[in-house]
Amino acid sequence: WYEGWEGHFELVKLNLQNPAVVDYLLDCVKMWIEEFGIDGLRLDVAYCLDHNFMRRLRSFCEELKPGFALIGEVLFGDYNLIVNDEMLHSCTNYECYKGIFSSFNCMNLFEIAHSLNRQFGPDQWCIYRGKHLMTFVDNHDVTRIASILTNKNHLPLAYGLLFGMPGIPCIYYGSEWGEEGVKAPDNDYALRPCFEEPKPNELTDFIKELIEVRRNSDALCNGSYRNVVITNHQLIFERRTDNERVLVAINAGDSEFTAGNGELQGNFTELLANADEIENITLNGQLTMPAYSVQFLKAV
């Protein structure tokens, strides 16, 4: 018989319990690795895939190309079911996707702070500690972040949060310069335009800086997560490894704010300062946060 994914019959539902089907798919993967040198695969609607197939795919790819990444699209549920040592390396973090734009639009940073702590916090019950989920502010299936945010001053802040939080940051093409696009009820054409040429701007430069800072920070790439200061308009959290400690501070408000907390102590370097304007600051229980700002403070 013939089935389609969720009633879409142009998207055939394959029988992944049929050895011949599995062998064919693995041959396709092998071709793409050997002919084109791809480094990984994104598995669409991974929550629908047979678990034994994902186990077979994982072992096959690891033997063929060590370090090959398998990332699944998952919208809901427990990500641990498929992101583990036997199946996928990562999956899309839709819980925090929603939390990012909603926190800014509602001016309630408690929402994203709660989600991040629930997923990656210091307590043993936190559900995704040690995992690297794919994080994003938009993609080919949802309205672009520049069209969702009600205050455009929050656009760079959303990217600052994206690159400061745990996970694997993913940027959708065009959004690095703030392209807008609203998902229609019956099609996604507005989300997937053909650009004649790039449109780099200040947001692009800021994202490039975020990428460089994160790439060179073990704490931002691999560190633990812990909330330090939370208000409706401000959030300070800590990323830490044995060798590095970074405070990520976000002020979504339209005025300067001074955060007070006994943990805001010591000497820090502002990682997002320009190379010729490296700023060293000493905290004595307080941090002054400019309006609409993102700060990455590395303990020295």
Region annotations inferred by a language model:
Residues 7-22, 39-48, 103, 141-151, ...:
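The substrate-binding groove and active-site-proximal loops of carbohydrate-active enzymes
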Residues 113-183, 198-202, 235:
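Substrate-binding clefts and catalytic carboxylate motifs of secreted carbohydrate-active enzymes
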Residues 17-25, 49, 53, 108, ...:
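Soluble or luminal CAZymes and related metallo-dependent hydrolases
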Residues 38-42, 67-71, 132-135, 169-170:
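Structural preference for beta-strand elements that scaffold enzyme active sites
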Residues 86-88, 155, 166, 171, ...:
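Carbohydrate-interacting/catalytic domains
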Residues 1-35, 57-63, 80:
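Substrate-binding/active-site clefts of carbohydrate-active enzymes
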Residues 28, 34, 44-128, 161, ...:
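Active-site-proximal helices and loops of the catalytic beta/alpha 8
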Residues 25, 32, 43, 70, ...:
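Conserved, mostly hydrophobic/aromatic
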